[in-house]
Swiss-Prot record:
Domain of life: Bacteria
Subcellular location: Cytoplasm
InterPro entries from the UniProt entry: DNA-binding_RecF, DNA-binding_RecF_CS, P-loop_NTPase, RecF/RecN/SMC_N, RecF_2
Protein family membership: Belongs to the RecF family.
Entry's Gene Ontology cellular component terms: cytoplasm
GO molecular function, one term: ATP binding
PANTHER family hit by this protein: DNA REPLICATION AND REPAIR PROTEIN RECF
Tagged with keyword Cytoplasm: yes
UniProt function note: The RecF protein is involved in DNA metabolism; it is required for DNA replication and normal SOS inducibility. RecF binds preferentially to single-stranded, linear DNA. It also seems to bind ATP.
Protein's recorded name: DNA replication and repair protein RecF
Residues engaged in binding ATP: G30, A31, N32, G33, S34, G35, K36, T37
């Protein structure tokens, strides 16, 4: 699906905007602080229920307003879908799909698979394991129907188990939680392992095009010892877990390691190379989704020129065009994106929260 229309009300510094969008490239050009990134963030929020620069809803609601409103129209091959999200300062959300309320944010995420590339996105590579788990979980969410429910139940059970660790004295008292936790943990780990294995060649091929000077390898670590039953791990770790008051092993401790020439990428690659790698991974993930399901990603790219020279920008642009996906790109100057423009693209100018085309 592509986003054909976007309405924004009281989001960041944007009071009102009604944008007719291209199914191809959409460029948002403006000075720093103009609001161009806010447009990208509005699209992201419409598909995720939260902003990517702040987790506190009050910070993205326009000054002295009580709530923001986002509305979009999605055009698929056979039908059009209307979606909407309202969120107030207390964080209460209302999701509307095709005119009916009561929907879940996960439904928006399913309708709008998107990849985000920002200057802060290096955390995928040099941040903690949670960012790389999120990378795998994005793929599992869009690939496995039962993943989101299983993942939500796992989070709930881990929270309950950690609370129980403060109160119990014998492992047998934890068995009611572990009886539910173990099959969920094993299923989620299986999904992650299968996904990381399935997409590995796509990632290797794309990374080779972007960073031919490096040999990159990828490895999934499930969060507990190989060839060890998770039930045994939980029982054996009980005393340590009780002392720590949290569960030290499990899928919530998984990681997806990326190495260049045998060394961690964060220790080997320059900032420009890290950005290229991040772009390559996001592209590979989106292309894999399209090949497996026929669904296309929506790409959000903030500050396109940052860290990339002309040749690398050209390579990224050509690969994005080849996906035939909808792409939103912000830039300080039109000169940075003019080579990407064609007869199907749209150029928006953003100034102090006002957007014109």
């Amino acid at each position: 699906m592509s986003l054909t229309r976007l309405l924004i009300k009281d989001f960041r510094n944007i009071e009102n905007a009604d944008l007719a969008l291209s199914p191809g490239f959409n460029f948002l050009v403006g000075a720093n602080g103009s609001g161009k990134t806010s447009v990208l963030e509005a699209i992201y929020t419409l598909g995720h229920g939260r902003a990517f620069r702040s987790l506190q809803p009050g910070r993205v609601i326009r000054h002295e307003q009580e709530a923001f409103v986002l509305h979009g129209r999605l055009q698929g091959e056979e039908r059009e879908t209307s979606i909407g999200l309202t969120k107030d300062k207390q964080g209460d959300s209302k999701v509307r799909i095709d005119g009916t309320d009561g929907h879940k944010i996960a439904e928006l995420a399913h309708l709008m698979p998107m990849q985000l590339i920002t200057p802060e996105g290096f955390t995928l590579l040099n941040g903690g394991p949670k960012y790389r788990r999120a990378f795998l979980d994005w793929g599992c969410f869009h690939n496995e129907v039962g993943f989101f429910t299983a993942w939500s139940n796992l989070k709930r059970l881990l929270k309950q188990r950690n609370a129980a660790l403060r109160q119990v004295s014998r492992y047998e008292q934890l068995r009611p939680w572990d009886k539910e936790l173990i099959p969920l943990a094993e299923q989620i780990s299986t999904w992650r392992a299968e996904y990381s294995s399935a997409i590995a060649q796509d990632m290797a091929d794309t990374c080779q095009q972007f960073l031919p000077e490096f040999s990159l390898t990828f490895s999934f670590q499930r969060g507990w010892e190989k060839e060890t039953d998770y039930a045994d791990v939980l029982e054996r770790s009980f005393e340590r877990d009780r002392m720590l008051t949290y569960t030290a092993h499990g899928p919530h401790k998984a990681d997806f390691r990326i190495r260049a020439d045998g060394a961690p990428v964060e220790d080997t690659l320059s900032r420009g190379q890290l950005k290229l790698l991040m772009c390559a991974l996001r592209l590979a993930q989106g292309e894999f989704l399209t090949r497996e399901s026929g669904r296309r990603c929506l790409y959000l790219i903030d500050d396109f020129a940052s860290e990339l020279d002309d040749a690398r920008r050209g390579l990224l642009a050509s690969r994005l065009k080849a996906t035939q996906s909808q792409v939103f790109v912000s830039a300080i100057s039109a000169e940075h994106v003019i080579d990407m423009s064609d007869e199907n693209s749209k150029m928006f100018t953003v100034e102090k929260g006002k957007i014109t085309d």
